[in-house]
Amino acid sequence: MEQRPKKLIEQVQDVIRLKHYSYQTEKTYAHWIKRYILFHNKQHPKDMGAKEIEAFLTDLAVNQKVAASTQNQALHAILFLYKEVLRQELDLKVNAVRAKKTKYLPTVLTKEEVVTIIQQLSGIHQLLIKLLYGTGLRLSEGLNLRVKDVDFAQLQIVVRDTKGNESRVTMLPESIAEELKIHLQSVKIIHQQDLQKGFGSVYLPFAKMRKYLKAKYEWIWQFVFPSGNISKDPRTGEVRRHHLHESSWQKALKQAVRAAKIEKKIGCHTFRHSFATHLLQNGYDIRTVQELL
């Protein structure tokens, strides 16, 4: 039987996976490429070019009112399609209307407001917010923490990039170290139960997976904040336990802020900004704070 030709989006996915880009990048690029095609009434991209790209990007800025970062994201996805998938060089100087970069001052909470919000949370969500505020981690960095990244002896946390390489080291507050140890004891029991059921593997960046073939089953590579459920990997089909989904924490935070009756625009980055501000207020020099971030 002859195999059917692959659809364009499947070709995009193949190239992204060959380059070992993250699953989030794959979803984002696929989303914008589909939007681009639908905007031009399902015309095939190989029959379009600079003029159509500019029209799409202009519409995003003028009619959709997207942020500059969103417009750039769409542009990168489309350029990837032409260069890496269609192998089509574009003589493109983008003359589209550019979305305006929004200038905003980050929200900073007082120490009392941080405590009030933390008190509205419980369990894994409360521990995660304590960690984000106490370390200056981004939400994605906190969710992607592995057991081996936590150094209780030195009271440090290793932060890794998307390829699993060490990018920086930040502090682990002594005030939450014991609570984190107890949490990891519970996580270890869950991991052992998963292994007994024939599961227990965890996602690893490609370079790490290739170098350490059995590492995905090892305790040290498990996520510090695992999901409550095992699920099927959308790329490989392997059933395993991923980390807690960011939407779960964001929903819990939103409810906590409402319960705390704090009238500020608060998101996951707020605790990172507050961490840095409070360190400076406590006498840390700005160079040290920048290194921790």
Segments predicted by a language model, with ranges:
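Conserved catalytic core of the tyrosine transesterase superfamily
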Residues: 1-293
